[in-house]
Amino acid sequence: MDNQLEIELNPTEILKKEFKSKMRGYDPEEVDGYLDLVIKDYQTYQENIDRLTADNTRLFNKVEELNRQLSASDSVKEVKPQQASAATNYDILKRLSNLERHVFGAKLSDQNGAAQTRVQNHSQFD
């Protein structure tokens, strides 16, 4: 079965429809009055369809725009962790360098002091 329903009538077709008269048939004025109500309903349905179609288009466009913004935001978020990682790595290297300077610098100072003492001791004996 087809999921899409097709509208077979429109307000103009309903208005132009003429019925044959038969003996003891329906009252033509009553039929016309009822068909006028049907026409108003069809017009209301068409207005609702037009409004909903416009809303649907507007919302579809909004979803597309938000998806574009989300994609752009995701690409920015991908760059930020790399920058943060680079900054963190730089900080770690800086701290490591300071620690090496502190630890090995003290040893170098001790070694330089010992070397100077030996040189001084050696020059005293000369």
Swiss-Prot record:
What InterPro entries does UniProt report for this protein, alphabetically? Cell_cycle_GpsB, DivIVA_domain, DivIVA_fam
* Pfam families, sorted: DivIVA
Coiled-coil features, chain-numbered ranges: 35-72
Annotated disulfide bonds: none
Main localization, broad class? cytoplasm
Q: Which domain of life is it from?
A: Bacteria
Q: Which GO cellular component term is one of those annotated?
A: cytoplasm
**Subcellular localization, per the record?**
Cytoplasm
Q: What processes in GO biological process is this protein linked to?
A: cell division; regulation of cell shape
Report if keyword ATP-binding is assigned: no
Keyword Coiled coil present in the record's keywords: the answer is: yes
Q: Which UniProt keywords apply?
A: Cell cycle, Cell division, Cell shape, Coiled coil, Cytoplasm
| Subunit annotation | Forms polymers through the coiled coil domains. Interacts with PBP1, MreC and EzrA.
Q: What does this protein do?
A: Divisome component that associates with the complex late in its assembly, after the Z-ring is formed, and is dependent on DivIC and PBP2B for its recruitment to the divisome. Together with EzrA, is a key component of the system that regulates PBP1 localization during cell cycle progression. Its main role could be the removal of PBP1 from the cell pole after pole maturation is completed. Also contributes to the recruitment of PBP1 to the division complex. Not essential for septum formation.
NCBIfam families on file: DivI1A_domain, PRK14127.1
- What is stated as this protein's family in its record? Belongs to the GpsB family.
Q: What is this protein called?
A: Cell cycle protein GpsB
Q: Please give the organism.
A: Latilactobacillus sakei subsp. sakei (strain 23K) (Lactobacillus sakei subsp. sakei)
Gene label: gpsB
